[in-house]
Amino acid sequence: MINVKSLKFNADEKLLDFIEKKVGKVEKFFDNMGDIDVTLSLLPDAENKSVKLQTHIPGEDLIIERNARTFEEAVTEAADVLKEKIVRAKEKKFAK
């Protein structure tokens, strides 16, 4: 399950749908993964859109933060990194 929280602003439906699609793809890579918490916030600098993804897989908490000019860009980067970490953790688990 994907839980989205936006700090100090209201995310529109288009952004929420985008997050569901991008982050939802990550869920299929690990069966026993916990919920994915997505936190959106605005920063005072040029790359002012911040995205934080948090989830738990057995034996490890995963937290990825990315900043970009748009939320879509930050979500894409964070989801890609999360996917890589999950795949690595899964490979490590099955290598034992």
Predicted regions and their residues:
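N-terminal, polar/charged subdomain of small-to-medium soluble alpha/beta proteins
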Residues: 1-96
